[in-house]
């Protein structure tokens, strides 16, 4: 379909199930496939009356459990945002696929528990190194090199490691095509309800 992905997607969407199945394939592939832009979706949250957005690496996607997993530094400002208001939107778009996927739901912060222990064990040394920096991300510094790590123990970074579990209740799928765009939304209330939308 696109130069960045080997997954097989429909050339046209005529059935609602196709849109949900394609979203599942795309996001499942994106967990390990860093060449697709869905590997780094935009996660938006609320800070007071402001919307705050950041790009994050997708670590896990599970459609059956309506779940996404992200990793972050527990000292980061976003932790407070998520704690005070856990309503979150996640959106990704890949121009090669001409597909946008938007999800809405709630996010939970895990720190120093079974969830973080398992995720930490599965993380590689390069990823763990990021959490060994003396200060958390977005802290003001005088020089650009003031955050550089010199001597550190990789495992010491665990105390700064946090896992974000995002449980979505809506998934919106948009496919752009000159012959006719297609947009669908899937909502999980008591049961799954799906419908087409005007693109």
Q: Model regions: which residues?
A:
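Charged, gly/pro-rich active-site loop segments
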Residues: 2-14, 100-199
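An N-terminal domain-cap segment
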Residues: 7-65, 69, 80
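A short, aromatic/hydrophobic, helix- or strand-capping loop or linear motif
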Residues: 34-36, 93-94, 132-133
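Short beta-strand or tight-loop elements
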Residues: 39, 54, 86, 159-162, ...
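Residue-level detector of beta-strand face positions
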Residues: 42-44, 89-91, 165
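Structured loops at beta-to-helix junctions and adjacent beta-edge loops in soluble globular domains
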Residues: 46, 73, 93, 167-169
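Short strand-connecting beta-turns/loops that link adjacent beta-strands
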Residues: 48, 63-64, 97, 178-179, ...
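A short mixed-secondary-structure module that forms the rim of ligand-binding clefts
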Residues: 59-98
């Amino acid at each position: 379909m696109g130069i960045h992905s080997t997954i097989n997607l429909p050339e046209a969407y005529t059935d609602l199930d196709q849109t949900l199945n394609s979203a599942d394939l795309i996001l499942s592939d994106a967990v390990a496939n860093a060449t697709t832009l869905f590997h780094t979706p935009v996660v938006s949250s609320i800070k007071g009356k402001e919307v705050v957005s950041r790009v994050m690496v997708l670590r896990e996607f599970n459609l059956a459990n309506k779940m996404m997993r992200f990793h972050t530094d527990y000292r980061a400002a976003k932790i407070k945002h998520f704690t005070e208001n856990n309503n979150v939107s996640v959106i990704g778009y890949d121009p090669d696929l001409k597909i946008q996927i938007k999800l809405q739901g709630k996010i939970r912060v895990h720190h120093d528990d079974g969830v973080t222990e398992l995720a930490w064990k599965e993380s590689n040394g390069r990823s763990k190194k990021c959490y060994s920096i003396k200060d958390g991300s977005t802290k003001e510094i005088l020089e650009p090199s003031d955050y550089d790590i010199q001597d550190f123990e990789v495992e010491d970074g665990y105390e700064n490691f946090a896992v974000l579990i995002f449980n979505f209740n809506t998934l919106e799928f948009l496919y752009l095509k000159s012959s006719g765009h297609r947009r669908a939304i899937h909502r999980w209330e008591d049961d799954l309800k799906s419908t087409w939308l005007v693109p």
